[in-house]
Amino acid sequence: MTRYMLDTNTVSHLIKKHPAVARRVVATPMAFLCISAITNGELFFGLAKRPDAKQLHLAVRELLLRVDVLPWGGAIAEHYGTVRAGMERQGKILAPLDLLIATHALSVGAVLVTNDRAFGRVAGLLLEDWTD
């Protein structure tokens, strides 16, 4: 079965109980869901900005207990350099953290689950939008 890497915006939709996203997550075995260590960092950044949001903290920590957080480094870093250089040559840009997440998904052969169309600029990246 396909591995699905949830982008930060998809995790946010899940935590906010977006019906379509929740349905897809429930229908997908947890072994096939993952997030990037970059998304993990973004989640903790969001929590640091809202230290009093107890329900949010609980929801994020519960998710992190259930989903694989894939480490970022080594071969992924090399792939990032190649992809970024190629995109710059073509005049394509993507937010820095988004490009780190995109190359992570590419490197591990995962479909990136996001509703951010900007990820479509990354050649070869498989995308799905679960907010539909």
Residue ranges and their predicted role:
Residues 1-35, 45-64, 132:
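Short, well-structured N-terminal submotif of metal-dependent ribonuclease cores
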Residues 1-2, 102, 106-132:
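Acidic, PIN/NYN-like endoribonuclease modules and their adjacent C-terminal/linker elements
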Residues 7, 36-39, 115, 123:
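A secondary-structure boundary/capping signal
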Residues 7-8, 21, 43, 80, ...:
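Generic structural signal for small/hydrophobic residues in well-ordered secondary structure
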Residues 10-11, 39, 76, 101, ...:
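Alpha-helix capping/helix-boundary segments
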Residues 11-12, 22, 41-44, 70, ...:
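Nucleotide phosphate-binding site architecture
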Residues 67-113:
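Active-site neighborhoods of divalent-metal-dependent phosphate/nucleic-acid chemistry enzymes
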